[in-house]
């Protein structure tokens, strides 16, 4: 009975999160990422971040994926419950000090702050397999075509 109650609570939380979720348009997300200081952060461009968000979640803030090891990944950047957030189920390091469900709404500043922490780790963007497979070494300018963002001309600049 206790397990059933836990499942009901989790489903209720996910339903509420889904109601406040958003699937971002590419250029809309590019603008948010640029405004949050991701262009040039640790030498990566908004194109890198758009590419990761596309392949991880399809720009969907409510996306949750479950891994064979029992951990889950949350939000637009698919932040893992074993390392970056706490879902109350998976043993976690919770390195971003955040509840995983807080990553499932349209308010992505907390996702961005946590993603910056991931990018600042020893793995940097390689922490996302999608970046290694689809983004690294590719022309990422296509991700920004038609978007009115003010990008830094020197992507090695970092104001953080």
Curated annotation (Swiss-Prot):
Pfam family name, one: Lys
Broadest EC class assigned to this enzyme: hydrolase
Keywords: Disulfide bond, Glycosidase, Hydrolase, Secreted, Signal
Highest taxon above the source species: Eukaryota
Locations listed in the record: Secreted
One cellular-component annotation, GO: extracellular region
Record family assignment: Belongs to the glycosyl hydrolase 22 family.
Descriptive protein name: Sperm acrosome-associated protein 5
Organism: Mus musculus
Gene from which the chain derives: Spaca5
